[in-house]
Amino acid sequence: PFYLSQAEEDFPLVNEDYSLNGQNMIIAYNSPVKDITVIGKPFNWGFFFLGRDRGLSFYWAMKLVVMVLLGFEVLMILTKRKKALSLIGAFALTFSPAVQWWFMQHVGDLIFFTLGLMTAFYHYFYNHDKKWLRTLMMLLVVIFGIGFILVIYPAHQVMLAYLLIFYFVGLLIYYSEKVSWDLLDVVLIGGAVLFIGGVMVHFWLTSKDALLASLNTLYPGKRVSTGGKWTIGEFFSFLTNWKIPFEDINYSNNSEVALFYHFFPTVFLASPFVLFGKKDSEQKLLGRILMIFCLFSIFWITVGLPKWLAEITLLSYVPPLRAILSFSFAACLLSIWFIAYIWREDVIPIWYKFILLAVNAWSYFYAITHSKMDNYFSDFETIAVAVLGTVILAFALFGWRRLFYLVFAALVIVSGFFVNPVVEGTGAIFEKTPAKEIQKIDQ
């Protein structure tokens, strides 16, 4: 409704049709606004030159297509250019329940911008000798950086910002002696910082009252989290993802349990074989960065920090339940990195692979039977989830690639393709009798 209302009112900064004093539309779920801040919202650009209906189509299509492309590029980096695995993984990210159930809200936007920044950071260093590509990557940093900041949902934003910091610092350390810094770096980095800073100053001057009002609310502004609150079922709620498009969860809501698929327990237990040693140092660097972030997230979720330290680190804005979603995103990237690595380097002994499979089956079964998921799944479904989930892992561990692609692709389709219906046009809204009457009054 925000987006369509903006199109009807010529995209004002403050839409007077909402609330007593109007609604600041930059803060309102990244709605399209004729303002410089729209630079950071590329999926909204279509509203300005395609009209209301086609602009909305542009929003959905661009967000989906570009997220697939960004996910593909990030995974090509992580997997050392394994195209088939990267393509399946890109669809697994874009059509993950975590993204699809929150597609027009914070998660969809933040994952989009995070993937964009990860791509731009990497290629800025990796292709440093190509000045035109360096310039293009910094332009993407400006666009995605502005977009990331303006989502303004710290419960997810803070953790994903930490992931980006870990990722950037890791790349900076690795490439610091491999690139020759020059004047162009000073111009690009300095220019990007100044431009982003200028946009943020403009945003503050035009939206200060609305932003302060939001931050002074009980939720999310005054909420203070210290971490350390979790249940086993929350970590494994992605096990429900295949079912919730067809039957609503009975102990929460579908968006709260929607996560990214991953095999983090397996990767953690296999880490002595895949994360240590000097061979493939760049690839191991990326895996180590993701593992460190996952462990950082787990520490916050399970142990927590004193209030004063949580506030200094901004983690006070991050409830553990929200942190689990960010953790699952990084764990998904790590899992795909892991699969690519063991397909290239057969470093895990066969006997240990069977131990990993047994632990996986037991952890799935235990997580379901010792959580609220036990009342959502039937006994047959519980066993089926444990068995089929372990079978998918077996396909990955033993390198049965075609079977893995087939079954995992089917899982992605079932879990994500049926969440948001395909609709043609906006007639379902504007052709209704109440809508027509409202438009007459507005005229």
Question: Where are the regions that the model predicts?
Answer:
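Active-site lumenal/periplasmic loops and adjacent helix-entry segments of GT-C-fold
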Residues: 1-112
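Membrane-helix boundary/interfacial segments in multi-pass membrane proteins
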Residues: 54, 58, 98-109, 282-286, ...
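Juxtamembrane membrane-water interface segments that cap and precede transmembrane helices
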Residues: 19-20, 43-47, 230-255, 308-314, ...
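Membrane-embedded helix bundles of polyisoprenyl
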Residues: 65-77, 83-175, 185-207, 359-367, ...
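Membrane-interfacial entry segments at the cytosolic side of transmembrane helices
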Residues: 131-136, 176-192, 281-286, 346-355, ...
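Extracytoplasmic
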Residues: 401-406, 411-443
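Transmembrane alpha-helical segments
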Residues: 67-75, 114-125, 165-170, 174, ...
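Periplasmic/ER-lumenal interhelical loops and adjacent helix-loop junctions
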Residues: 201-286
